[in-house]
Amino acid sequence: MADVQAPTIGGAGRYAPSPSGDLHLGNLRTALLAWLFARASGRRFLLRVEDLDRVRPGAQQRQLADLRAIGLDWDGPVVCQSQRRTRYEAAITRLREAGLTYECYCTRREIQQAATAPHGPLGAYPGTCRDLSDADRAERRAQGRPAALRLRAERTDFEIVDQLHGRYRGPVDDVVLRRGDGLPAYNLAVVVDDAAQGVDQVVRGDDLLPSTPRQAYLATLLGLPVPAYAHVPLVLNKDGQRLAKRDGAVTLADQQRAGKSPEQVLALLTDSLGLPPRPPRELLADFDPARLPREPWILTDNGLLQPSECP
């Protein structure tokens, strides 16, 4: 079959891995889906490295090589979040000037021990530092507590529309904008980057669906467009947990050491999606998100991680 290129409609999709280790089969499957969603709809496909936090030496280079090995390409240079901190600080300044931020001195343990959130849903940040007096803040600074910066949310939930899940309403709380160590928080960085890069389609694992209303709400506060979302099922081990090294041959390099070629690994991924064993570009003509599996792909460890039926 000849390669098919959809008409360009503008906008972009993206894949945004963290260089904390090698990509496993679940990561590669999600990357393939993000690529197919974008290319089939005529969008550009961008690659962004979320390297604000833990970075393992050489991981980024291996990740890019693995994506190329299964036939994925991208438009423009790879963007690294570590080079974009001025953008995040500008967004924080905008929220601060609007009176929508406050300092938070809570430890993670203190937050977990809070039974309820008085101004938000169960499990949300309890608002301990929301209305501290100047004296309270001075006391906490004197104790040497590092201050994170939180959003002063003005609502408790927000609704988004997901291409696979439909309308989804989830909690919104006072998310962290800047961590206590000074690093921009994930929820802020991803919102700023998607808007700055013209990303109007976000395809990622459905474990991130619960955090999406927070991100969409934050985008609206910053006057930024909310992208279209599609949260896809994860790849799980036989116990229903996310893949890890202990599950066997979970990376492309592992599979190659076990005797499989990148093309065979790609065929494994496409088969799990109900797609034929073809190069990615040859899948575009017949790609239909409505026909994708809606359940996780369950793998068993027999040395090569062959797929098994979902329970």
Curated annotation (Swiss-Prot):
A GO cellular-component term linked to this record: cytosol
Cofactor(s) needed: Zn(2+)
Entry's Gene Ontology molecular function annotations: ATP binding; glutamate-tRNA ligase activity; zinc ion binding
Enzyme Commission identifier(s): 6.1.1.-
Cofactor binding, note field: Binds 1 zinc ion per subunit.
Sites where the protein binds ATP: K245
Positions in coiled-coil regions: none
Chain positions of motif 'HIGH' region: 17-27
Keywords: Aminoacyl-tRNA synthetase, ATP-binding, Ligase, Metal-binding, Nucleotide-binding, Zinc
GO biological process, alphabetically ordered: glutamyl-tRNA aminoacylation; tRNA modification
Binding residues annotated for Zn(2+), in chain numbering: C104, C106, Y125, C129
Pfam families: tRNA-synt_1c (PF00749)
Gene3D superfamilies recorded: HUPs
Protein purpose: Catalyzes the tRNA-independent activation of glutamate in presence of ATP and the subsequent transfer of glutamate onto a tRNA(Asp). Glutamate is transferred on the 2-amino-5-(4,5-dihydroxy-2-cyclopenten-1-yl) moiety of the queuosine in the wobble position of the QUC anticodon.
Protein family: Belongs to the class-I aminoacyl-tRNA synthetase family. GluQ subfamily.
PANTHER family: GLUTAMATE--TRNA LIGASE (PTHR43311), GLUTAMYL-Q TRNA(ASP) SYNTHETASE (PTHR43311:SF1)
Official protein name in the record: Glutamyl-Q tRNA(Asp) synthetase
Organism: Nocardia farcinica (strain IFM 10152)
Name of the gene: gluQ
